[in-house]
């Protein structure tokens, strides 16, 4: 933006960072067990962040959660940004079924964004741990 190549962050993403664009860098990912081990070795808690954003089928989401738990994952972000109540209930049920903890996040990335305010999100459902 400072160089004048784009006027906004949204324009930068549309112009340079989408699939097949110049900033689309293909890379290889570490395995799920390796990623979880790194997180835990660093003293962190392995959490699946905003799983409703991945647009998985229910079956694929369930498989991801089961694989995550089997690899040592500990929690699912049950509440994120402005998601709807049915999504929260689905994610809470997945937590319970897989004996995982629940987390919450506002999905805040930067000042001025329109989809989420810092610290402004619903509480985790009472039946989650």
Can you describe what each PLM-predicted range is?
Residues 3-7, 34-48, 52-129:
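Charged catalytic cores and adjacent phosphate/nucleic-acid-binding surfaces used
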Residues 1-28, 35:
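Active-site-proximal loop/helix segment associated with metal-binding centers of metalloenzymes
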